A protein has these predicted regions:
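Bacterial Sec-dependent N-terminal signal peptides
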Residues: 1-28
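Short S/T/G/P-rich N-terminal loop/turn motif that feeds into the first structured element of a domain
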Residues: 24-247
């Protein structure tokens, strides 16, 4: 009887020890993105087809949020995000179903140009000022590309910027690219109060807030660090299209 209790206790302890690893493995902090560009004369047909596709085949971990790109080099394109999900669920996703893939190929892709891009990103909680799932309809995405070998230094820059965001109430979700071209951090500003947050005077100047959060003279060092460690950065505005997204 005593031996049986010891065996059961050992098994229970092993179960508890494995729980943290199970939790880590199932963290839903991954999103996949797909940018597509419809033919100029087929926009209405594309929108109808992509809405039907999203609402029929994309739910749960495969939920779609579809954005219209309003500015920047990809103006006129559509930015599709899938997730959040875990790597495990992405591993099991496959093509979702033969019907799903057939619908995309025959009913959606026929309206697209050859231009497209896509990738994976992982949400960085330690660099963000808003929860992963706290979405908004209007966003700005800033794409930041570190110089080769300078990723850690760019993260250090972002940690200081986060202090300024927190001080001024700016809500930003930060993602790191994963196996998707050059190393990139995407800073997604989620406008909780709409585009009026962009207006001059809505918040204190960034330089003032940054120096309050990081110390007098810190903004000058920030500019030097950006010049030294960042290869390139650019921004764009995107508007959510609920009518084209998953329900």
């Amino acid at each position: 009887m005593k031996q049986k209790i010891v065996v059961q206790l050992s098994a229970f302890i092993l179960f508890l020890a494995l729980l943290p690893f199970t939790g880590i493995g199932q963290t839903k902090n991954v999103i996949s993105t797909h940018r597509v560009f419809p033919k100029i004369d087929k926009i209405a047909e594309f929108e109808k087809a992509v809405a039907n596709h999203a609402q029929k085949y994309h739910a749960g971990d495969n939920h779609w949020r579809v954005f219209a790109i309003q500015s920047g080099p990809d103006l006129g394109g559509y930015h599709i995000t899938e997730g959040p999900k875990s790597w495990e669920s992405e591993d099991a996703r496959g093509d979702i179903s033969p019907e799903h893939q057939n619908d995309w190929n025959k009913n959606v892709a026929i309206y697209l140009t050859e231009k497209q891009s896509g990738g994976y990103s992982v949400y960085q909680e330690s660099l963000s000022t808003i929860a992963l799932g706290d979405f908004t309809d209007k966003i700005q995405i800033t794409h930041v590309y570190p110089k080769p070998g300078q990723g850690d230094n760019v993260v250090a820059i972002l940690k200081k910027i986060k202090k300024a965001w927190e001080a001024s109430g700016v809500t930003v979700a930060v993602y790191a690219s994963s196996s998707s071209g050059p190393t990139q951090y995407t800073l997604t500003t989620r406008y909780k109060q709409g585009l009026k947050e962009r207006a001059a005077g809505f918040r204190k100047p960034f330089k003032e807030v940054y120096e309050t959060a990081n110390g007098e003279g810190s903004f000058e060092q920030y500019l030097k660090d950006v010049a030294e460690y960042v290869q390139e950065s650019w921004s764009e505005l995107l508007f959510m299209r609920k009518d084209l997204s998953s329900k």
